Amino acid sequence: MESLMPWDARDTMSLRTEFVLFASQDGANIRSLCRRFGISPATGYKWLQRWAQEGAAGLQDRPRIPHHSPNRSSDDITALLRMAHDRHERWGARKIKRWLEDQGHTMPAFSTVHNLMARHGLLPGASPGIPATGRFEHDAPNRLWQMDFKGHFPFGGGRCHPLTLLDDHSRFSLCLAHCTDERRETVQQQLVSVFERYGLPDRMTMDNGSPWGDTTGTWTALELWLMRLGIRVGHSRPYHPQTQGKLERFHRSLKAEVLQGKWFADSGELQRAFDHWRTVYNLERPHEALDMAVPGSRYQPSARQYSGNTTPPEYDEGVMVRKVDISGKLSVKGVSLSAGKAFRGERVGLKEMQEDGSYEVWWYSTKVGVIDLKKKSITMGKGC
């Protein structure tokens, strides 16, 4: 199998860390992961062994001096806290403590860390936040991915439209990409890269705006592309952003830790900042909803691999099959009906209903519309 994601100097450490976190989980298919990451099994097992023996330090090209020192003074601890705060100034005491421990440092109790940070002005300012609500999550990775654009903002090269994609179960960030627009073609290009790296989810949810949805309920070309890949598509309820609450929380962290008060000269600087923070978020930053584990420790790439190839729809015997023409229309018993531009060139199946002259319109395994020949009408949409 051709290598999909060869390692290079720019992101070697983050890829090694992703690999060992995924490969260390129960039931992991290590050889399949090696193919996904573009490395040989021998290399994969080498990094797994180093990870088991030395932790994060074992993934470095050069071994680092261990940080373990059981008898550190208050000044030593404070110096560590200052260093961690300089790197992650928006993190509180709980995240800082866990992060330093993950780096190999022996830390005192949480109360001591909190008091030291408060004494030296290292705690982030309190923010009003959003009232806590009941939290729901899927029971395994890749059952549901949440996708959205974070509000666009100016930078030295124009405007940035950050595309974000989050796994519901693990909170793992699958994509944080600088985009210059919000067109379907731009989203598909980014999603292909994500699918090649992490496989296909069972379902994806988005809001109702362009390019993934339509406020009128009409099917979009992006929805059809995802459904053709076997991905079920859902949408958040209008005016209910909490439906995508995990992604909204991710956006607030992105704003606070990366964007707030910053100016980026060009797209390269901007994407490097996104890539760095995504690595920190996935592999270093403790997550309170995960009992202070990092998202990368809870995520596993999907077993459903992306090939780019799709099979045409097949319909049961007795189902009337019609092809939608280039203008988005189909003909049923001499009646011309508009199925919509998204279905141009597609073969749809018509299942006769009990009421004479009425048909359900199906595309693959999804009901996409209803036809009433008596009224010479067709209704295409998600509520059919």
Swiss-Prot record:
GO molecular function: nucleic acid binding
InterPro entries named in the record: Homeodomain-like_sf, Integrase_cat-core, IS481-like_transpos, RNaseH-like_sf, RNaseH_sf
GO biological process, one term: DNA integration
Coiled-coil residue spans: none
Name of this chain's protein: Uncharacterized protein YagA
Record-linked Gene3D superfamilies: Ribonuclease H-like superfamily/Ribonuclease H
Induction context: Expression is repressed by the transcriptional regulator XynR.
Segments forming domain Integrase catalytic: 137-303
Taxonomic source organism: Escherichia coli (strain K12)
GO cellular component: cytosol
Database matches in NCBIfam families: transpos_IS481
Transmembrane segments: none
SUPFAM superfamilies documented for this protein: Homeodomain-like, Ribonuclease H-like
